[in-house]
Each structure stands twice: as structure tokens, then as C-alpha cells.
């Protein structure tokens, strides 16, 4: 499906962009730039936990893996580690659990390990059966970067950079992340530019998620063909639109079982 959409866009001349709002979020873009510039040395290990307490009545609890925590939440750490390592993984391993007391008829918690060609490792957990939590860190030969919160919107993101025994805390104001990605895409259309998070970027994530599926089904690590993605997040993509006020939900509800 990814390749069909990429081909259709190329044939028609349409602009195709994956709506990855964090590709335009200032804190995320700044941290990726620091790691890319060598501030923490060669990146070695990425770790992340992303979880929520999903209500069993929510539609995402009804369709197994396809609506489960990996496709819903796991794509965030998958995309982040690919950007920080500046490479594509070559091996995928995964394990999963079902917490019987949670009432979800699916693997509600999944742990994934990605091996990168430069011996970098990414390890993350995505879960529908834990308290709401989001965090990631990347540790390099000379330092580390850590985010908490990491993937959400509605708050200003911040992170710590630790090098040489010193910690530099960087805080960024809240932005309208959805407006930022829309403005970026509008510029691409108006100025006839190719979006950075294009169809290929989405395909790179989907092929990893599908490898996670196979790893869970077989109980074995899955090998991915080496692949070189040439485009990555650039500093110029950071968008600083001011946040808007609270928006009323229409025919929707909070997916958490802890919602009031």
C-alpha cells in the first residue's frame, strides 16, 4: 500500500506527506540536530517507553495488532530512533504480553529491539495496559539526551543534554504542532518543494512495524534488507506557531479508562 501511494503521487504530480507533527516540533528538531552535530559522540543506545491505559470499549481494542500499541504508539519511538541514528535498522526482535486483568483481546504490551548497521541498538516498549507515560533517551559515547514528556502535544517539550558531567536543560514553548505541519505542507505546495516526511519516510516505518508483527508471530528475529534513506529532519523544519485554545471534541471521547 505504501509503495502504491508513492507511485500514484509520482505519476500524478501530487504532493504526498506523512503527517508526522514531531518533524516540525522545535525541541525535537533541536535535539536531533545536536546529536547529528556530535554533541554526545557516536549514538549507541536509544530507549523509550510510551504507554496509556486504554479503555477496553475504545475502537482500538477491537482489531488486534493492526489497531494495537505498535501501530498506534510504537511508530513514535521507531521514527525517533531512525532520526537520531540517521540510519535504518537491519534486524527486528519483539516480545509481547497480554495482561488478563486489563480486558483487552490483543497483545497490549509489546517490547521491541532494533539493531542498526553501525551497532546501534534501539529498545522500546509500547503499551495499552499501563499508566500514561512517555519518555525516550539516546546515549552516545560522550553524553546523552533525554526527553520526558517526549511525544505528546499541548505542552512545551524539554530535554536534558548530559556531557562531561554537566547537564544542560533546554525548554521550548508550547507550539501548535498540527498547525505547524499544515503550514509546512502548504509551503511545499505553494513553493513546489518535496516534503521531507514523504511517502518513503512512512514506508521506512511501516516495514519495521510489519517486521515486528512477523517477529511476534514466529518468535524469531527478523532481518531487514539494508536500506539508505537519504533525507532526514533538517533544522529549518522547526515551526513555532503559537498554540490555540482547547478544542471541543465532536463525536469523540478520551480513549483512556482513567478519563473523567
List the model feature ranges, each with a label.
Residues 5, 31, 211:
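Aromatic/hydrophobic pocket-lining residues that form π-stacking "cages" and hydrophobic walls in ligand
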Residues 26, 180, 197:
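Residue-level signal for the nucleotide or nucleotide-sugar donor/cofactor binding architecture
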Residues 72, 78-156, 172-175, 179-193, ...:
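Contiguous beta-strand/loop segments that form the cofactor/metal-binding neighborhood of enzyme cores
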